[in-house]
């Protein structure tokens, strides 16, 4: 169909590989560089002359198919797409396709879209074809790919399903939030390949023998790139540790395991050998916990022939008090080494424990098991550990062993949680208090709007010189049993755990040295 454009354009016939196609040509003053390049590519007879500027990226010149031409639907934007597909595939127009057709039937030709489709690129739900601004740098792992190995294009009629080449690339118009999960732009070799029958829109992209970094520029007017634009702007180099995790949170761990730099640490054995007269620590260093534990077990603890099960770790709080069994000594040494060989088996938990009993108690938080029933008649309360049941028993006995330690306050409570709520009345946190919020309320017991007396100032001065652990003890409330001495309770004894878990808190203050 021949006609004349209302703006003074003219119709001319262009032969593309022997097939005559009607092409509308606007006046020379209105023709853009993009259309000139398109005409040059369409009429060029030599396969190595191309419009991309990269040798070897020209299209095949034989067995081409005529493109679907709609001259009457020419939009205002002259930078239309060069695509072998029909109008149903014209959702991503307005750009120049840099990817060569890897199959003879997928020949590139000039086409025009309606003004509605050329105003801005729209994400087609089943297309991942990149535009000229998707400047892709790929680094092939196989030498055959660098020698010209080709793969079928994404829109080729012949759907050959094979693995992606092992490469790394980023496409600014890739499907970051594709509904079907296809078209992943980052590291396709890391995740599982797509199921059969799904197009691989990233096949057939142009290969550049460049060993550079990855660069990408997102479309500023594309909706799915609003989230990605905060990660990489303009042509800045991308941080792989951040962007991979943002694009593929499920598969980033497999890649980041190889990206993390190993942290070098030295574990020092501080066991004091009693056979030496100097009584100096062993001081041998180890790079892994496994090596340190084996060293202590073999060299210091000894085998069944050892009758005295005493811990000689430097500055051990037991001060030479023996254990009744070897396994108890082994469990105690974990307080010093920091070993926790019992991980929680539930997915996503990640907690580890030094004692199997503590792991058993912890697993009840996942299973909901509460084997400890209240011993008082008429009460159906059940608990996951015995310590919680003990705290609950004070409700029935009317005992109030948890006293407020603030001077001038004689309040007492049956449960530590009630005392914690009461302490909020008295307490205010100083600026930058490290223990603030550790158990749900500020740690320093200073009355509100009450100036400190000289005696209180001296007490505060002395407590500030104490170690952090001693300071924490002074800042906690007093649990005073009837007719018993005053006992200071730390956070570990009030947590929802068994009394055997008190050893877990001491691991935080262990003598293990890490450099």
Swiss-Prot record:
Q: Does the keyword Phosphoprotein apply?
A: no
- S-S bonds: none
ZnF bounds (C2H2-type):
267-300, 309-336, 342-366, 372-396, 402-426
Its tissue distribution reads: At blastula and early gastrula stage (stages 9-10.25), expressed weakly throughout the ectoderm. At the late gastrula stage (stages 11.5-13), expression is restricted to the prospective neural fold region and anterior neural plate border region. Expression becomes enhanced in the prospective midbrain and hindbrain region at the late gastrula stage. Expression in the neural plate border region continues in the neurula stage with expression in the anterior region more enhanced. Expression represents the neural plate edges and part of the neural fold.
| Entry's Gene Ontology BP terms | central nervous system development; neural crest formation; regulation of transcription by RNA polymerase II
* Compartments where located: Nucleus
Q: Which GO terms describe its cellular component?
A: nucleus
PANTHER family assigned to the protein according to its UniProt record, in alphabetical order: GLIS FAMILY ZINC FINGER 2 (PTHR45718:SF8), TRANSCRIPTIONAL ACTIVATOR CUBITUS INTERRUPTUS (PTHR45718)
**What protein name does the entry list?**
Zinc finger protein ZIC 5
Q: What is the lineage of its organism?
A: Eukaryota, Metazoa, Chordata, Craniata, Vertebrata
The coding gene here is: zic5
